[in-house]
Amino acid sequence: MIPICPVVSFTYVPSRLGEEAKMATGNYFGFTHGAAAQYSQQPASGVAYSHPTTVASYTVHQAPVAPHTVTAAYAPAVATVAVARPAPVAMAATAAAYGGYPAAHTATDYGYTQRQQEAPPPPPPVTTQNYQDSYSYVRSTAPAVAYDSKQYYQQPTATAAAVAAQPQPSIAETYYQTVAPKAGYSQGAAQYTQAQQTRQVTAIKPANPSPASTTFSIYPVSSSVQPVAAAASVVPSYTQSATYSNTAVTYSGAAYSGYEAAVYSAASSYYQQQQQQQQKQAAAAAAAAATAAWTGTNFTKKAPFQNKQLKPKQPPKPPQIHYCDVCKISCAGPQTYKEHLEGQKHKKKEAALKASQNTTSSSTAVRGTQNQLRCELCDVSCTGADAYAAHIRGAKHQKVVKLHTKLGKPIPSTEPNVVSQSVTSAVSKASATSSSTSSANGSSSVASPAVKLLTSSSSMSTSNSSKVSSISSTSIVKKVTTPKITFIGGNKLQSTGNKVDDSKMSDISKATPSSAAQTQEVKIDPMSEAAQTLAALQSDVQPVGHDYVEEVRNDEGKVIRFHCKLCECSFNDPNAKEMHLKGRRHRLQYKKKVNPDLQVEVKPSIRARKIQEEKMRKQMQKEEYWRRREEEDQWRMEMRRYEEDMYWRRMEEEQHHWDDRRRVPEGGYPHGPPGPPGLLGVRPGMPPQPQGPAPLRRPDSSDDRYVMTKHAAIYPTEDELQAVQKIVSLTERALKLVSDSMTDQDKTKTKESDEKKEPTKERALKGVLRVGVLAKGLLLRGDRNVNLVLLCSEKPTRALLSCISESLPTQLAVICPEKFEVTSSIPEAAIILNSCVEPKMQVTITLTSPVIREETPRDGDVTPGMVKDPPDVLDRQKCLDALASLRHAKWFQARANGLQSCVIVIRILRDLCQRVPTWSDFPNWALELLVEKAISSSSGPQSPGDALRRVFECISSGIILKGGPGLLDPCEKDPYDTLATMNDQQREDITSSAQFALRLLAFRQIYKVLGMDPLSQTNQRFNVHSNRKRRRDSDSVDSFEAEGKKDKKDYENF
């Protein structure tokens, strides 16, 4: 093909006036726009062509090669065009390829093929003849043709054919955005902007008026273009340069007839409904701009113009289909679609979809264990094979299949697929991600969901399949190969091809791994288990009760419905009859009314499950409450003990201090009065006082002085304490030597008798411990007996007892030269050690072993434990009593030793039990428990007198009587009353004696209870013996003796 090369020369005449000059002021040419160089007011490099600000006229001299006036369309050239600026190029060959320049053109003659990455899209040719009312074009018969520079702006209310005749808005729209509203695609004459490609524009630089004439040639080049339309799958990207170097491009691809026309028809209809207000404003602005352009006052005020090309009316547009992805339905029109979006059904499904996305792990764990059969097309799940088959045959599924067939969407296979609840959640999350991605890419000003306008000719199969594949078992993401037109309620048309936005690709890449990961989690189970589950779901349950379902016919004998007598229900679907007979409800009624032996799976109701969960939750809360309460009680008890210890420590220090102050010698201080406080607040010669303000202390009462005086009288002397300490320490050391000797003998015998290596046996004697009053510190003056417990590794026997009793004197002789008498008592299971030096002391060593208490005889059989025992084992009860004394000593050291006045009061009462026969039957261990409970239960620390009074009050209240609460032993596993050894008479006698002692305390006669003489009064006013009045001989003797006799009688009764 030979290219037509017209030579066009432009002559610049700066002084021309008249109508043509005014028209030229607008700088309007018959050039169409779409992919041409852009005009602006900033000069670009290599631009020699400039426009003045004065009135100018342009004449075009056409070479005789072209038969008519040139109104060049922008077309790319193969070779570099040596021009001063990027100018429009006439391409005759291209015009020939598109059907030449005749006026009659149809929209179907234009096909859009796939563009390569570097080639700008070629627009349709522009005709210069037969212009309609939109243009005022003047042709000149002279060789120099003058162009009318005025372009009349037409409002964007054109018909669909006029809109469809515009050059390639589907491709160029994404890259060339206009200032005026979008419906008519009207643009400013000298300003172009791009939405997605940033390009530098060539500016128009003002130049001085000059009569010089600039001539340049335009060489159009031919480009072979296939007349068959093809879908544009590649959006070209442009690189701005001073000159355009484009090569000839051959376009090829699949043909999509009517694709562009349908798109622009949809765009026209949509924007006519949404942007009528903006069109009116744009029309007013265009009129004002046109008026300013005719005045020629300013070069920059140029009225926007639209393309000066017309095409014949297009064929009727195909019907629009508004499809809702959430509800899987289509709407007839935008109004119906809008009403659907505002309806309750759509809102409920959308809320259900959001709820499924926000499903917690607990709900998933409850409902996720049930396998279901899912229909990918309708996005519904069925609990069994029968339900799935009924759904496939149902009208809803068939309707969706028909709609997808009409839209050209792929229809998934109807084979049932086993899915779980986690798969459904993954699908919902994936769909939510894709919808959020599409809404984020479009600048939407409407809050409604995206409206998808689909035509029957547009193929959406690939994008649909990609969405389906993202939720299927495989995580393969298919590449989008066809454009997806989505109108989102805004003012911007999005048309995308293979070049997907980076943000969308990033969102897709982020969404895909998550869905793939969820799918992989679902497919952890092997295929065999999935097959078994599918077989279990598809396993047919035998229908029962055919005879109880009767057919209801009309007058003509036609079956209109079915009625089940068992369930009292009716249904008109023949398919539902079989399902009802297999259903759980019908089977339960059949089992209840007909055959009780029918096996029906037990499926707990949601209400029962919720009740069970509520019970478990309350139980856990109750356990947590009690656990916390126990911890708090334990913490309070520990804090109370700590505070009491600290308080009593300060009290003792203060008591020592005041005792030292009261013990000042009669002659005064030996070294003079105490001096001033030292550097650390301590007076010389005085014990250090506690820091801080001294707590207020109640002065000693009369009862306290009596109790302390009595305690000092019954406390052991220093000689007795040293004697006890000496004999106990010697006994402990001797028993240690006996244990060592017995261990050495066992080793020697083992080596001689057997050469085999055996595990080393434990020592026969594990240790010796102090028990009784010796361990508790309750010794009284005159006590000569102390107790020790010797722990053995095995059950003690008579042979062991005799062996120890024989070895003990030898070891004692090694340690101490003094003589001791050692005797063994088999009935008492003990060894008795007596000293021969005054004060004579006696130590009772009881043998026991922890193995005895660990034995628990079986129910109904008392002898198994005794069968294994050696024949000469010692008395079991004596050994158990020794173990109990160990526990008692440990408890006393932990609980009673820390209480103030507790040990003092126990010593006083032990002395009372020894002096008064009534109290001799009171057990020592029960007495210790009673005193500890009485003192520890008080609100604060008790002085010795108050503590003794409180103990008598407790006994007087009847705590030890037969019907009383008693005293449980805290050292025993099973409940055991420590007062069990006392009879009723002994309990009543002790209670009565305590009440009498309490009366004596109330009348200041505590000395009678303690069995001591009254103390002398330190104050002379209360001293009876200092009475100066002379006593009558007769009265004094009778009254004193009588009073003394009465006191003596009361004391003896106590």
Swiss-Prot record:
Locations listed in the record: Nucleus; Cytoplasm
Coiled coil: none
Superkingdom of this protein's organism: Eukaryota
Start and end residues of each DZF domain: 683-1053
Biased composition annotated in UniProt, kind: Polar residues: 355-366
Cellular component aspect of the GO annotation: cytoplasm; precatalytic spliceosome
Gene3D superfamilies, alphabetized: 1.10.1410.40, Beta Polymerase, domain 2, Classic Zinc Finger
Region annotated Disordered, chain positions: 342-366, 491-517, 657-702, 741-761, 1023-1054
Ranges of Basic and acidic residues composition bias in the record: 744-761, 1042-1054
Keyword set, alphabetical order: Cytoplasm, Developmental protein, DNA-binding, Nucleus, Repeat, RNA-binding
One GO molecular-function entry: single-stranded RNA binding
UniProt cross-references to PANTHER family, sorted A to Z: ZINC FINGER RNA-BINDING PROTEIN
Function: Involved in postimplantation and gastrulation stages of development. Binds to DNA and RNA.
Protein name: Zinc finger RNA-binding protein
Organism: Xenopus laevis (African clawed frog)
Lineage of the species this protein comes from: Eukaryota, Metazoa, Chordata, Craniata, Vertebrata
